[in-house]
Amino acid sequence: MRVSSHNSGGKRAAVLLALALLVPGCSVLSGGGPPPTFDLSAPEQFPRASRAPRAQLIVQDATAVGVLDSDKIVVRPAEGKIAALADAQWSERLTRLVQVRAIQAFENAKRMRAVGRPGDRIVADYQLLLDIRSFEIVVEGLSAEVTIAAKIVGDRSGRIVAGRVFTARVPASATQGPPAIAALDEAWGKVASDIVLWASTVI
């Protein structure tokens, strides 16, 4: 349900309702069965590459700390505070979802000779390391924010070839339920697309 930007009373009411549905950090929803689960999508539309794919890439397991390394959907009700939605969760640990959807994004872009995860039968030229810094709904201002630090490492040398921090913020029409997840998915899609395009110019 969308909250109009000019309706400040309705917007405040929506925020207050959403805050009532939050649980602190790592608390667990009690009763009523498991909450509905949500997934992330992989970007599909990319500009045509200017050269033929030449590198093979392994995307390592993404890393994160605290509640981000779980299936909880994070909300930031105020600066310095985090909570988790009580009425929703990711279909898997967020770190796993990010790795899988990042691989799919690279496959969709067709900018690598091959891309996979550790254990796949790929003779990798490079590894991509992803560290999730933020992946949350920000209550103040109603927005979704995703920040991921990416590093490209030479598979044989073990040296960092390049590194960059990617951030996307998009408006959210609500702080919980499908509208909040849609905003997070859009922000993630922007970051994932930027990572793919950046990596394809570096290697």
How would you name each of these model-derived features?
Residues 7-8, 197-203:
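Generic C-terminal helix-cap and adjacent flexible tail
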Residues 1-26:
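Sec-dependent bacterial lipoprotein signal peptides
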Residues 27-48, 53, 104, 108-159, ...:
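Surface-exposed short loop/turn segments
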Residues 62, 132-135, 167-168:
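Generic short beta-strand segments
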Residues 95, 99, 103, 109, ...:
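Extracytoplasmic/secreted envelope proteins and their assembly/folding machinery
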Residues 26-95, 124, 202-203:
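A structural "domain/chain start" motif
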Residues 81-89, 156-193, 197:
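Short secondary-structure boundary motifs at beta->alpha junctions and helix caps
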